[in-house]
Amino acid sequence: EPVLRRIQRRIITCRRSDGVELSFTLCLPADHSPQQPPLPALLWAYPREFNDPETAGQVSGSVNRFNTLAGASHLFLVSLGYAVLDEVSMPVIGSPADANDSFIRQISDSAAAVIQAAAEIGAIDPARVAVGGHSYGAFMAATLLAHTDLFRAGIARSGAYNRTLTPFGFQNERRTFWEAPEVYMQLSPRSEEHTS
């Protein structure tokens, strides 16, 4: 665990294609230097809903706190030579009545911007990135794996992947399945599985 206490942490900010400000904490192994080759990475996030871009763009993390690890923390991957893009802001902006109509586009744009920002500073290899999350973050990870080519692998812990099984709403979705069946189907990554 001493290695994990010395994780290098850095707040990175960037913008997604629609101009929304994003931030994430770049976690690197204690002995990593900028002269070394880019690392494989894990992007770990949990999407959150916002009514406006200004609120969504606020930086919420800090490098001035202790590394706390519990259970099967994704930060253990740093000790194995991975970069971890942690506390990634993954905002879904819109009215509570219809924010999920653009959920896939918004999280895809956020993921692409964060990967590009970390790659541009030489920290990660954009061809070797995994995505992960827990609960709603797991749903996000499965959705990104189903709808983008940004990731090579994923960790989806305890998520809901078939929204037709939550017909009376989920997260901040207020419409029922019967009011917005196309949204429920689109947001069911289980129905988008591809085999190769």
Model-derived regions, located:
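Flexible, active-site-proximal loop/turn residues at the rims of small-molecule/cofactor binding pockets
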Residues: 31, 48-49, 91, 160
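Short, conserved, GDST-rich strand-edge loop motifs in beta-rich repeat architectures
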Residues: 51-64
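Short beta-strand element of the alpha/beta-hydrolase
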Residues: 28, 36-49
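Short beta-strand motif preference
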Residues: 22-24, 41, 85
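Short amphipathic alpha-helix with an adjacent loop that forms part of the alpha/beta core around
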Residues: 33-36, 191
